[in-house]
Amino acid sequence: MAISYADNETIAAISTPMGTGGIGVIRISGKESLTILQTIFRPHNDSCSYRSHQMYYGQIVAADGHQLDEVLVVYMRAPKTYTCEDIVEIHCHGNFLVLQNVLELVIEKGASLAEPGEFTKRAFFNGRIDLTKAEAVIDVLSAKTRKGVDVAQEQLAGSLYRRIEPIRNALVHMRALFEVAIDFPDQSHDIVDYEQIDLQLKTEVIAPVKELLAGVDRGRIYRQGISMVIAGRPNVGKSSLLNAVLQEERALVTSIAGTTRDSIEEMVDILGMPVRIVDTAGIRRQAGEVEALGIQRAKDLINSADLVLFMVDGSRQLDQSDLELYEDIAHKPMIAVINKLDLLAEDGTAAAALLDFVPASVPRLAISAREGEGLEALKQAIFTVVTGSDTPWDEEGCAPNLRHKKSLEATLIAAERMVDDLAQGMGSSDLLSIDMQECLDQLGDIIGITTTDDVFDVIFSEFCLGK
């Protein structure tokens, strides 16, 4: 249910990740923050004035006088804080046991343990950020690549809100005209220029909404990434390629076919995309029981992958087993990779054979995983196949997420329905006003104006404790 934080309880949580580190931070937010700090903090300087946004050195001390830790603290006075409430941060040594002891003392003095995302939830309900910025905080925390961080930071800076607000303003203006026309029906045609409304709907609503929808899949790729499987017969160099892309000896490489018997997965940044790259067991008909299990797992991974690198050995002629493997994976998005460029047969038999049964529409590249040749071209090909673009997208165009998609699609449907009604001479002010309000409600749902409580619960539950 909706919550007003005007006189809500003071909350606290550990804001830094679990584990050992140099510094660990406990965050407190609410009207009792400073009072709680004053009861547990012994400043090094007895004349501590607790000026806002200034750090103080001292000790956290339990009621019995026992020192829990030597700390730095900062008090931040509302409203110029993350939550628009009084906030205290206690910077302790980064041992989780120390942090837990201090947090328990803070709770003992009157704070409640914060729920996941509750600090950001308060920032939203107290008007500091809109809902798109709250979601961007999640994306900043979970981004897997630098490009993903840039996309999230762009949204955190308000890029999505800035693109939606002009659309809403145009709709508000048009709807206001309709409302006046409804009140004065005999003058409606003098009040509303329906040709102008048609033009505005097309240029100020439909066109920008379509642009926003185009960014949903882009944003998904940068946020969630893709899965990519390296598939091929035994000993074609799949593990060597994994090691080359990761620039580390992650997979065991030998000249013995069937060395890899289980899948090896790692995350890699390819032109800003998080790519979960999977090295699989070489697929062949004759295999022992353990290897056969690895082969079946490889087939399962191929079926669930977003992209398959179909690898062949360029130092030998291809045979029926290569063709059979290709036929098994032909339904997947694919790049054909001819490995062992350094040993490539002089007559080009591997490349020529690939041309025989791989469609021309499938990108193909010759590389040497061992020597690192052709890897940059392969990365570019991977990016192009996945995105349909040769260059990375700008961050602003990647802001919308899957939650926004539903609202944008509903907005588009309502706006296009209005255009159709106007074209057929069926658009009355009262009916058009209803569709206008539908558009406003859907766009308001994105930025948090008309969002339902259950949606809030889902969004903020994705946060970690302390944020």
Swiss-Prot record:
Coiled coil: none annotated. GO terms for cellular component: cytosol. Residues 225-387 form the TrmE-type G domain. InterPro entries: G_TrmE, GTP-bd, GTP-bd_TrmE_N, GTPase_MnmE, MnmE_dom2, MnmE_helical, P-loop_NTPase, Small_GTP-bd. GTP binds at residues 235-240, 254-260, 279-282, 368-370. SUPFAM superfamilies: P-loop containing nucleoside triphosphate hydrolases (SSF52540). (6S)-5-formyl-5,6,7,8-tetrahydrofolate binds at R27, E89, R128, K467. Its EC number is 3.6.-.-. It is found in: Cytoplasm. It comes from the Bacteria. Belongs to the TRAFAC class TrmE-Era-EngA-EngB-Septin-like GTPase superfamily. TrmE GTPase family. NCBIfam families: mnmE_trmE_thdF, small_GTP. Homodimer. Heterotetramer of two MnmE and two MnmG subunits. This is tRNA modification GTPase MnmE. It comes from Desulfotalea psychrophila (strain LSv54 / DSM 12343). The gene is mnmE.
